[in-house]
Amino acid sequence: MWIKELELKHYRNYDQLLASFSSGLNVFIGNNAQGKTNFLEAIYFLSLTRSQRTRADKELIHFDHSTVSLTGKIQRISGTVDLEINLSDKGRVTKINALKQAKLSDYIGTMMVVLFAPEDLQLVKGAPSLRRKFIDIDLGQIKPVYLSELSHYNHVLKQRNSYLKSAQQIDAAFLAVLDEQLASYGARVMEHRIDFINALEKEANTHHQAISNGLESLSLSYQSSVVFDKKTNIYQQFLHQLEKNHQKDFFRKNTSVGPHRDDLAFYINGMNANFASQGQHRSLILSLKMAEVSLMKALTGDNPILLLDDVMSELDNTRQTKLLETVIKENVQTFITTTSLDHLSQLPEGIRIFHVTKGTVQIDSDIH
């Protein structure tokens, strides 16, 4: 899939903008604080109904307006789709082909994106919540039903934690009802995650071996707070551990086990990647991003859109080459932001150049 056209109204520093794109590489050049990242953020927001930079929708609204509108024309294998998101003080409205979508899971996945930004280099050593978010964003696009099950899980988790904080003593019967619901939704969330990580590991290892010239293997491990011996009995084991932890959870006023506490670990040649070099970290993250692209295509039959936000300068020529080879081979529409073309020595022919200045975007040329 690829985005043919994007229209922004009152989005950050873009008052009015209409732009059309190449189905291949699109490069946005401009000084810092001109709106390059805002532009990629808008594509990300149109895909996932959320910003990668802020949770406050009001920050997305142009300073002298009260509403935001984003519309995009998406070319999928199945045909052209029109997406629209409107933000106001009354909330947000999402539409597909002018039809309002009642559920997030009905909208997300229509336009898939993979974002590679400098912050992703913290994925290995950062907080576990970053890695859970990484899993959730990819899975939500590949399997929209996952978002529904995760939402149900989080709702019951909130109920259980609220009860634990307010109760003077344990009502075993009431807690048993919440435990059963939490274990049911949580088991399905974990099953989806495990399947995803197993599939991602195969793709990521293939890319990592290519980047390292066969010298390094990459493996991933889903680190669950629920102890289980096989995937088919997660529900029973989760339920048992919830019941076993009643007193501990009551004392701590929160739920001590479940997918909300799970993590993801990375290993290079069997060694924990926390101890890897900076170069190995870059290769690992690059391998993951390329694996996201190839896995989404394998599981959905369509390519995602790749957003590279000021990361090419973080990669040496070898890693740039590997990334762009994958983009060209997989025929992935790609958006690159940069302050200069000087360090983009490996750009292929056929790219479209845009200049970004103070919230305006001007097409430079198509290079053949």
Swiss-Prot record:
MF GO annotations: ATP binding; single-stranded DNA binding
Tagged with keyword rRNA-binding: no
Predominant subcellular localization, coarse grouping: cytoplasm
Compartments, as annotated in UniProt: Cytoplasm
GO cellular-component term (any): cytoplasm
Annotated residues for binding of ATP: G30, N31, N32, A33, Q34, G35, K36, T37
Span of the signal peptide: none
Gene3D superfamilies reported for this sequence: P-loop containing nucleotide triphosphate hydrolases, RecF/RecN/SMC, N-terminal domain
TM segment ranges: none
Keywords recorded for this protein, A-Z: ATP-binding, Cytoplasm, DNA damage, DNA repair, DNA replication, DNA-binding, Nucleotide-binding, SOS response
Entry-linked CDD domains: ABC_RecF (cd03242)
PROSITE patterns membership: RECF_1 (PS00617), RECF_2 (PS00618)
GO biological process assignments: DNA replication; DNA synthesis involved in DNA repair; double-strand break repair; SOS response
Family: Belongs to the RecF family.
Function: The RecF protein is involved in DNA metabolism; it is required for DNA replication and normal SOS inducibility. RecF binds preferentially to single-stranded, linear DNA. It also seems to bind ATP.
HAMAP family found in the cross-reference section: RecF (MF_00365)
Name the record gives this protein: DNA replication and repair protein RecF
Organism (species): Streptococcus pyogenes serotype M3 (strain ATCC BAA-595 / MGAS315)
